[in-house]
């Protein structure tokens, strides 16, 4: 191996342990395709600015296209990073007098920052698509369960009757915010550092705006020092992923709980379950458990990124090499988790009978009974709260006579004397009527849920339109880049 970097300044060759310690080749596989694009755009710009000759540009571009077709497997993995390995392969193909000109006016510092942003950009767009698919699945399942009664929980204790639609749209709303955070994060990722060189830009007459356009970036990171040293876009992305995974972990936790015999609200499709090596009857929700655990991985990746970037002096430091594996792991885990969650929800069986049967367990209708007392009997809510609280010590199905007896002890008179009837009590204890009365914006009534789901679908349509525009902008830019490549080669 002839190292095109070390042969000048450095006299000795590192041993295998040092090479393995300092190499980023494994993580750099993630940015291989982006590195080719960056090289193509930079080379075209060099030719346009007359920094390299047209014939050298042609040979370099042809070599890069060959390397692209050969794939990363053909590169020498003993080099310390993908950039030097790729450039060395190019020089082997076209000679140093030609291939050695490609890196004019450029550093690995701005090169790697550009590659990471390009690759992350693509994955963010894919994540947006996957989040939209998940939100659609949640909305569809909610629409099918507008009248599916279930207990609502606080502190994991039965609280009030609600519906499965109400419960799932809460998760859908959270996923919607995750989608919007991802879209907002994209704006700061899709900026070009290319042309910043090591940190002080270059004396070559580069056109940074030209490479920015060729690669489909929305703009430049203008300060060259900031361009090569900033990794806050990785921290922001990892924060978005961690927040998303926390939201998914909540759903995963409920899937695990709801799959138990004690709840038996749902049953996962067999594809998302496993069995025991000793207990043949077991059907374990392993996929949901793993997703729940993987949320911790993304939190760990975020913490690692924060620690790596902490207190680094300007401008570039090699510490930043350790950031790439962490964002890769976080991103891959998050995207896989979104797809898995979508599949679990789309294919799970819902036990509506069990859900409805437990909708009133634990006196979940107590709040509506207290509200009825306030509306009918004109007593303060705190007084009604006390009366119903005493009744909660009983069966959870109080009669008018039992209510009057407690009321006598609390306020010195019966509530029936204030207009409360047995029919009103029964209606207050009816979980279906409980839900139907809660028709305020965001409440669990079927009418309210229909409005919320329709509003959610309108937002998804808007998000989809924005996403399609982002994808089109990227695709058009890359298509134009390859058109420019063909023009340079065909001259």
Curated annotation (Swiss-Prot):
One of its GO terms (molecular function) is argininosuccinate lyase activity. GO terms for biological process: arginine biosynthetic process via ornithine; L-arginine biosynthetic process. The keyword Amino-acid biosynthesis applies. It is an enzyme of class 4 (lyase). InterPro entries: Arg_succ_lyase_C, Argininosuccinate_lyase, Fumarase/histidase_N, Fumarate_lyase_fam, Fumarate_lyase_N, L-Aspartase-like. Keywords: Amino-acid biosynthesis, Arginine biosynthesis, Cytoplasm, Lyase. Its main location: cytoplasm. GO terms for cellular component: cytosol. It catalyses: 2-(N(omega)-L-arginino)succinate = fumarate + L-arginine. Pathway: Amino-acid biosynthesis; L-arginine biosynthesis; L-arginine from L-ornithine and carbamoyl phosphate: step 3/3. Its EC number is 4.3.2.1. It is found in: Cytoplasm. Belongs to the lyase 1 family. Argininosuccinate lyase subfamily. HAMAP family: Arg_succ_lyase. This is Argininosuccinate lyase. It comes from Methanococcoides burtonii (strain DSM 6242 / NBRC 107633 / OCM 468 / ACE-M). The gene is argH.
């Amino acid at each position: 191996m002839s190292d095109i970097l070390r042969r000048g300044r450095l006299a000795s060759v590192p041993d295998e342990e040092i090479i393995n310690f300092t190499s980023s080749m494994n993580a750099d596989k993630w940015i291989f395709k982006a590195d080719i694009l960056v090289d193509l755009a930079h080379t075209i710009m060099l030719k346009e600015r007359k920094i390299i000759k047209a014939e050298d540009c042609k040979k370099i571009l042809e070599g890069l296209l060959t390397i692209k077709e050969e794939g990363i497997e053909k590169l020498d993995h003993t080099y310390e990073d993908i950039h030097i390995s790729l450039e060395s392969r190019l020089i082997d193909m076209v000679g140093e007098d030609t291939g050695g000109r490609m890196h004019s006016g450029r550093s690995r510092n701005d090169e790697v920052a550009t590659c990471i942003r390009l690759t992350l950009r693509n994955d963010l767009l894919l994540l947006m698509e996957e989040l939209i698919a998940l939100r659609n699945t949640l909305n569809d399942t909610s629409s099918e369960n507008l009248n599916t009664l279930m207990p609502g929980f606080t502190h994991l204790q039965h609280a009030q009757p609600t519906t499965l639609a109400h419960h799932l749209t809460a998760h859908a709303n959270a996923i919607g915010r995750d989608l919007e955070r991802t879209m907002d994060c994209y704006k700061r990722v899709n900026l070009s550092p290319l042309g910043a060189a090591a940190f002080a830009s270059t004396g070559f007459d580069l056109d940074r705006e030209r490479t920015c356009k060729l690669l489909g970036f929305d703009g430049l990171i203008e300060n060259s020092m900031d361009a090569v040293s900033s990794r806050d876009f990785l921290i922001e992305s990892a924060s978005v992923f961690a927040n998303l995974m926390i939201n998914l972990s909540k759903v995963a936790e409920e899937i695990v709980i709801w799959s138990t015999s004690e709840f038996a609200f749902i049953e996962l499709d067999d594809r998302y379950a496993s069995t025991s090596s000793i207990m043949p009857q077991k059907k374990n929700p392993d996929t949901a458990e793993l997703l729940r655990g993987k949320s911790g991985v993304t939190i760990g990746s975020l913490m690692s990124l924060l620690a790596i970037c902490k207190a680094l002096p300007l401008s570039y430091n090699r510490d930043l090499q350790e950031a790439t594996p962490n964002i890769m792991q976080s991103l891959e885990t998050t995207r896989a988790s979104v797809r898995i969650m979508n599949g679990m929800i789309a294919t799970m069986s819902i036990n509506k009978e069990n859900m409805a049967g437990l909708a009133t367990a634990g006196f979940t209708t107590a709040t509506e009974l207290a509200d009825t007392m306030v509306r009918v009997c004109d007593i303060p809510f705190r007084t009604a709260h006390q009366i119903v609280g005493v009744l909660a010590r009983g069966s959870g199905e109080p009669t008018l006579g039992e209510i009057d007896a407690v009321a006598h002890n609390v306020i010195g008179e019966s509530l029936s004397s204030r207009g409360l009837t047995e029919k009103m009590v029964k209606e207050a204890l009816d979980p279906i009527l409980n839900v139907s009365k809660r028709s305020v914006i965001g409440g669990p009534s079927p009418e309210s849920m229909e409005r919320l789901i329709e509003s959610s679908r309108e937002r998804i349509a808007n998000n989809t339109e924005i996403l399609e525009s982002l994808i089109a902008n990227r695709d058009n830019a890359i298509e134009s880049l390859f058109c420019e490549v063909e023009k340079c080669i065909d001259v």
